[in-house]
Structures are given as structure tokens and as C-alpha cells.
UniProtKB/Swiss-Prot annotation:
The gene is hisB. This is Imidazoleglycerol-phosphate dehydratase. It comes from the Bacteria. Pfam families: IGPD (PF00475). It is found in: Cytoplasm. SUPFAM superfamilies: Ribosomal protein S5 domain 2-like (SSF54211).
Amino acid sequence: MAPRSAEASRKTKETDISVSVHVDGSGKSDIATGVGFFDHMLDQLSRHSLIDMTVRAKGDLHIDDHHTVEDTGIALGQALTKALGERRGIMRYASIDLAMDETLTRAAIDVSGRPFLVWNVSFSSPKIGTFDTELVREFFQALAQNAGITLHVTNHYGANNHHIAETCFKAVARALRAALEPDPRQPDAVPSTKGSLKG
């Protein structure tokens, strides 16, 4: 399997973002978005997926965090799409239930080339510190759309909003790790009867 690494950037009047990923990494991350809680979540995404990530983001944080979070999801998804190429030799599907104290969250992934998000997660507060909880969904929507993955995220239960958000990132990370693993029985095959995972 060829090295699965790529870069992507996005520059608008609202944000200036650069991302690099190495899918077959060890979970090293170098994250600086200007949004502390989001940096923490991206670090979890990298660490538990074993995807090495470098993220640099400058956004209009004087307005709010929305553009920075969403556009980082866009750039990260685009980098993953480039890194995966034809998506040959991958397991493609994965799901995981991930526990953190009182919280349990499920993530299921199909690296299909067809972007879709099903989101069954609710928060009891609009904020975690200064971070808008609605931005968790916005990030995963942007990631799924631009990475070409079908992603289902369901929070079964939980009381702590930080834990709910963190289990979303960790569950998606662990599911991504499993779905992107090389398939030793089909090392050069596109895992689709269509012969393509381009959408």
C-alpha cells in the first residue's frame, strides 16, 4: 500500500487553514486553531485514530468559533480524501461503542465515497466553557462531507457535556482507525462490488 499522506488548505475571508495528515501514523498531533476545547478534541481524534495530524487555523474568532471549526472539518476531510486515493485495500466499515465514565457513544463508519451524517447526539447545555456544543455536529458534518464517508453517531446516554463531546470524537477516531486499516485478505482490492469508492 502506498504511503497515505496528504495536505489540504482553505483560505477565505473568514479563515486561513492548513492541514496535513498521515493515515498510517502513531497518533501524533500538532494542533493550533485558537479554540482551546476544539484543539483538545482534535488531539483526541488524532491520538485514537493513529492518524498523525498537523492543523493550523486562523479564523474570525472575534465573531465566534463557527467558521474556524467548520472550515477545519472541511480541510481535514479534503486531506483525508487525498490521502486515501482510490481507497484500495481498506476494511471500509467499522463501528464502536465507546465508554467514558457515565457516557456511552456509538460511531459507525462506511468509507464509501458517499458523504452522509446521521447525528443522534443531544447536549443539556449550549456551551462547554466558551465552546458552542452545536459546533460538534458542524465539525462532523463538514468532515463527513469532505472525506466522503457515511458517519452515524449516537450518544446512548451521558450526563456530562464534556464527556458526551469527547466520546463523539474518540468513538469516531476508533471507528476511523478500524475502517482504514489494511485488509490483509484483499490488499489491493477496492472493497465494493462497483469497483469504485469514488461516490
